[in-house]
Each structure stands twice: as structure tokens, then as C-alpha cells.
A protein has these predicted regions:
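Cap/insert and terminal regions of metallo-dependent hydrolase folds
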Residues: 42, 48-53, 59-162
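Core dinuclear metal-dependent hydrolase active-site scaffold
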Residues: 2-69, 163-182
Length: 182
């Protein structure tokens, strides 16, 4: 309602670029590494003493780690290499070389759950919310295979799904999950 896309300069490595400042809300863009796509950005939102950072599509990045330092909520995309490689093998065995190639290529420009967890730990964030889950969770028990030990690196996490939401009450340290999915 009333919003429209606006072009902005590409943020520099290690810097946040303010793209919106209104009524105490600050939205800043940051450069992320989604090679071969360039530029690619994530966003940091700050309001009344609270903050969250959404990575956008990216591989593990020291830039994210630096710019996410101390945020309340890190919303980080992640791809499970152990499962994607099984999908690669299945596509290859079925003779679908195009799909098999995609499954290998995407490993180069997405973070794994363990890499996102390491970023969250190193950045000293309050909570890690995984999103843009690859492959999607479609069967019971798949989350354990997907997370694949990353919980040992950063145990304060949620694997996102449609409808998951969080509240960060102003001027507090509370991180409250308000919905767990549809």
C-alpha cells in the first residue's frame, strides 16, 4: 500500500547503505555474495532498539557476519548440500543432465545450515531463522536431515515455513515466535 520499488546504489563491501528512514524505522541494504548474480543484497531493519537482518540469497559471507553483529534476529537462507547431492544423483541416474547440473551449481551460491549457524554464532545474534529452505520440507522427519548437525553450532534457531512469524517488542530483549506456520 503506497510502496514502490526504487533503485539505489550498490552497497560497498563492509558497509550498510540506508535505503529508507521513516518514523524511526531504518532500512539498510548490504552487499551479499550470490555469484553469478551481481549485485545481490540483503537488508537490515532497525526500529526502537531492535534489529533484524535478512540475508537474501547468498553463500556464507564475512560481510554478513560483520554487518549482522548483535542483531536480534538473523533471517538466513540455507540449502542442505547432503540432500541436494542426493537429488543431483537421482537426476543424473534418470538421465536428466540439465537438472543434475543445476543441483551441483546451486551449491556454489547458497549457504548450508551449518554455515548459516556459524555466521549466527560468530555474529552473536539473538536468534537464527532459516528461510528459503532448499530442498523444501515435504515429509515428516526431514528437518533433522536438513539441519544435519547445525544445531550444535547455534542451538537458538527456527526452521522457517510459510506463516512463521516473530515479534521483537520495542526497547526490550524479547524475541518471541508468534506463529509457527500455517
Amino acid at each position: 500500500a503506497g510502496l514502490s520499488a526504487q533503485p539505489f546504489a550498490t552497497p560497498k563491501q563492509g558497509e550498510l547503505l540506508t535505503v529508507l528512514e521513516k518514523n524511526g524505522l531504518i532500512v539498510e541494504a548490504l552487499l551479499v555474495d550470490h555469484t553469478p548474480v551481481h549485485p545481490a543484497v540483503g537488508y537490515k531493519f532497525s526500529y526502537k532498539g531492535r534489529s533484524l537482518l535478512i540475508t537474501g540469497d547468498t553463500k556464507q559471507s564475512s560481510n554478513i557476519e560483520t554487518l549482522a553483529h548483535g542483531v536480534d534476529l538473523l533471517v538466513h537462507e540455507a540449502l542442505a548440500p547432503n540432500l541436494v547431492l542426493k537429488m543431483h544423483s537421482a537426476a543424473k541416474n534418470a538421465g536428466n543432465e540439465g537438472v543434475a547440473k543445476i543441483f551441483v551449481d546451486i551449491l556454489d551460491y547458497h549457504a548450508s545450515p551449518a554455515e548459516a549457524a556459524q555466521t549466527a554464532k560468530n555474529a552473536d545474534v539473538g536468534h537464527l531463522l532459516y528461510y528459503h529452505i532448499v530442498p523444501p520440507m515435504v515429509i515428516p522427519g526431514q528437518e533433522k536431515l536438513w539441519i544435519n548437525g547445525a544445531e550444535a553450532i547455534f542451538p537458538t534457531y527456527t526452521v522457517g515455513e510459510d506463516g512463521v512469524s516473530f515479534s521483537l517488542p520495542a526497547n526490550s530483549e524479547v524475541i518471541q515466535q508468534t506463529a509457527s506456520g500455517l
